[in-house]
A protein has these predicted regions:
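Residue-level detector of Asp-centered blade-edge/turn motifs that repeat once per structural unit
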Residues: 44-45, 94-95, 139-140, 224-225, ...
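Hydrophobic beta-strand positions that form the internal "hydrophobic ladder"
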Residues: 49, 96-100, 141-145, 229, ...
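Cap/lid segment of the alpha/beta-hydrolase catalytic domain
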Residues: 236-237, 288, 407-529, 536, ...
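Predominantly five- to eight-bladed beta-propeller fold
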Residues: 64-65, 149-199, 232-235, 242-247, ...
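Multi-bladed beta-propeller domains
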Residues: 18-37, 59-63, 69-88, 103, ...
């Protein structure tokens, strides 16, 4: 029996076009034309916004980042750095006369540049062997601090004989000794450690300020007098096996002396200095041994004393702290019910929402996210998103939002997009409220049923929201309704909801997902005889788990899954994290727990035709996971196919052509098995 407490359908997108309006639907080629705003940085006086504009390029098959400048009064914008290469991380000087940024304009490693706004001249001020990150201006505008990998020597056991001159020998042996030796999107990690540097803002020799065989990370900030730089680092003796144990450090600019300001078990990061220099706001949490703990906002005196939580009573994760000019409050972003917002947190712990509806950089799926910055007068620059548009640039003053860009009107204004509606139901497991969104085929009429794709988010500690998603729009254009669910464990609903899957994933989230499917059927939208399922990463785990639990779905597309928790923990790039926090025991200590949570344990039940997709260079959910499912299905005699995406990391969607082909393959697979499949009689 299907049980529902209530179903609410609320419209988040524009209504369906009138008969004389645009009739074209979203199509794969449009992926090359989309643009999105990111990293909005408002000038100190609030008059201009620099932002990163990500634009599709059909000739290079990539999203190219460039930097644009907007006048906040007129809305006029112009490219600041938009030539060949990737241009990112614009940061204003304290007086607003210059803009530092990172660019690969000259090829090779990314370098640090400074743009003088009055003259329009840009100067490269570094010639670094590896890319800088986390750039921060000194208070007087004379120096820039940044973090950079300092290459180290690879370990060596033995050596080959001397090579004769002119001989062509094989590459030397590659010896590995690090616990974490691969990183997704990077491959085998280059030997070395990230360290803090400063460099004159008009060019000169960089000076290194941190040392030792530890990584030192941003975001970073300067003390008000310019004598110290604050950063975070995990310098514990067993830092390789204790990934969540970083502290805030003060680095003396003159002597390079390092002084810890925090000393608890847990990750403290993102130090942000108050305007008067007396306090430091930062992010962190007490390590509970859980796979997910909401990050809180803290404040302490500049010497590390009087540490206290400001959001201890606020049951949401916060990020991106930025002080208000009066020093009496701190701005942060947070997610609530899949929607990203900005709040102002007082030193008394009060929390007041000042902006909502932010949009993130993800285009393929409707993840929550977004960025903001704040001017001295409290004006906010945000990336504003919606169900019908990728992120734009907007300003928020006095609670009123004004969108300054229309990056995709040339494409999307002439498209009929699928409407996005909210559904709320209750889980059949324990009657907890479960929130979801339905993307409907263009031209949908009430009472009309459609084949349904259950599309499951990754993480699993993440959240979907009413956000633009190319995957969903392509599915909808093909005639499918798409269901995006936030099952238990999803973020933005509080710590207790997230904890429901601690060492219990996958598990009762299955009931949440199926209850949402039943709600879509009860709403008169989904055809109960034409159900399909897909998802990536954590969604790949759950889509493979679902077809091991039920035969209700005609076909599945399992993307970048984890199938065998033992092999995942021992081959993924975050090995110390998975074993320590997801299980609390090594595979040889509690093999039953690993197997009980492995979708492979249910492979003998699967009768659903399943397409399996994975990036060939995925180091987070390695290809061997997808291959195990593919092989198991073949051995079972269940229809299957394996797609490896060449050059793709866990991200999978870095190249628009591959992204379009991936969605097309999923739609072809679903069409092939639209009537289901029955095993042959033996």
């Amino acid at each position: 029996m299907i049980r529902h407490a209530f179903i609410s359908l609320l419209l988040f997108a524009a209504p369906a076009a009138a008969a004389d309006g645009p009739s074209r639907t979203f199509e794969a080629r449009d992926l090359f034309s989309l643009e999105a705003a990111a990293d909005t940085q408002i000038s100190p006086d609030g008059s201009r916004i620099a932002y990163v504009r990500r634009s599709g390029d059909i000739m290079t098959d990539r999203m190219r980042p460039s930097i644009w400048l907007i006048d906040t009064a007129s809305g006029e914008q112009a490219p600041l750095v938009a030539g060949p290469g990737a241009h990112m991380s614009p940061r204003w000087s304290p007086d607003g006369s210059r803009l530092a940024y990172i660019s690969t304009a000259e090829g090779g490693a990314a370098q640090l540049y400074v743009r003088w706004l009055e003259s329009g001249e840009s100067v490269r001020i570094t010639g670094l062997p590896t890319a800088p990150s986390s750039i921060a201006w000194s208070p007087d505008g004379r120096q820039l601090a940044y973090v950079m990998l300092v290459p180290g020597e690879a370990p060596r056991l033995g050596r080959a004989p001397s090579r004769p001159e002119g001989a062509q020998w094989a590459d030397p042996l590659q010896q590995i000794s690090a616990v974490m030796y691969r990183a997704d999107g990077e491959g085998f990690i280059r030997p070395g450690f990230r360290h803090l540097f400063i460099v004159p803002a008009d060019g000169g020799a960089p000076r290194r300020l941190t040392f030792g065989e530890f990584h030192h990370d941003g975001p970073i900030d300067w003390s008000a007098d310019g004598r110290n730089v604050y950063l975070s680092a995990n310098r514990s003796p067993d830092w390789e096996r204790e990934p969540d144990n970083s502290e805030i450090y003060a680095v003396d600019v003159a002597s390079a002396a390092l002084r810890p300001l925090t000393d608890r078990r847990g990750p403290d990061a993102a130090p942000t200095v108050s305007p008067d220099g007396r306090r430091i706001a930062y992010l962190g949490y007490d390590d509970r041994g859980y796979a997910y703990t909401q990050t809180r906002l803290y404040v302490m005196d500049r010497d590390g004393s009087n540490r206290r939580a400001l959001t201890g009573g606020f049951d949401r994760e916060v990020s991106s702290p930025a002080w208000a000019a009066d020093g009496n409050s701190v701005y942060v972003s947070f997610d609530e019910g899949g929607v990203t917002k900005v709040a102002r947190v007082g030193l008394d712990g009060s929390v007041r929402t000042v902006a909502d509806g932010l949009g993130g950089a993800d285009l393929d799926r409707p993840y929550s996210g977004g960025s903001f910055s704040v001017a001295r007068d409290g004006t906010l620059a945000v990336t504003a998103g919606s169900a019908s548009r990728p992120a734009e640039v907007a300003v928020v003053r006095g609670g009123s939002r004004r969108t300054l860009t229309r990056l995709n009107e040339d494409i999307l204004a002439h498209k009929t997009l699928g409407e996005v509606r909210r559904i709320e139901t209750r889980s059949s497991h324990d009657q907890r409220p479960i929130e979801a969104w339905l993307t409907l085929p263009p031209g949908h009429r009430d009472g009309q049923r459609h084949p349904l794709i259950l599309e499951i988010h990754g993480g699993p500690w993440a959240a979907y929201g009413p956000n633009f998603a190319t995957d969903n729009q392509l599915y909808a254009a093909a005639g499918y309704a798409v269901l995006s669910v936030n099952p238990r464990g999803s973020t933005s609903y509080g710590q207790e909801f997230a904890d429901l899957i601690h060492r219990a994933y996958p598990g009762n989230d299955y009931d949440d997902l199926i209850s949402a499917v039943d709600a879509a059927i009860a709403a008169g939208v989904a055809d109960p005889e034409r159900l399909f399922v897909t998802g990536g990463s954590g969604g790949g785990v759950l889509s493979s788990w679902i077809i091991g639990r039920t035969n209700r779905f005609r076909a599945a597309a399992v993307q970048k899954p984890v199938i065998n928790m033992v092999s995942q923990v021992l081959t993924a790039d975050a090995t110390p994290y998975f074993a320590r926090y997801w299980f609390g025991a090594m595979p040889w200590e509690d093999h039953e727990a690993y197997w009980r949570r492995s979708p492979l344990s249910l492979a003998g039940n699967i009768r659903t035709p399943a397409l399996v997709i994975v990036g060939a260079e995925d180091n987070r959910t390695p290809p061997s996971e997808a291959e195990q499912l593919y092989t198991a299905l073949h051995l079972r005699g269940v229809p299957t196919a394996l797609i490896r995406v060449p050059g793709a990391s866990h991200n999978l969607v870095g190249r628009p052509s591959q992204n379009a082909a991936r969605v097309s393959a999923i739609l072809d697979w679903f069409q092939r098995y639209r009537n289901g499949w029955q095993p042959p009689q033996r």
